[in-house]
Amino acid sequence: MIHVLKTWSEYFEEVFMGHKTFEIRKNDRDFTVGDILILKEWNIYTKSYTGRSLARNVTYLFNGGSFGVEEGFVVMSIQ
């Protein structure tokens, strides 16, 4: 499945540079390994999209409820 996600500029840039290889999100979309995330850069000051986007594959899921991750959230490894 493909998920289009709003991503703040500071985090978008870290994914773009390859430094950030995970996403933490509310799991209200039933994310699964193999999903594609389309990360669209969002400027929080202008409250608008910048026009930049990235596609990343979900390679691993950690469901919340333990190890400090809140129930209902998911940590996704992305490539």
PLM feature segments, named:
Residues 1-79:
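Catalytic phosphate/metal-binding cores of nucleic-acid and nucleotide-processing enzymes, i.e., regions
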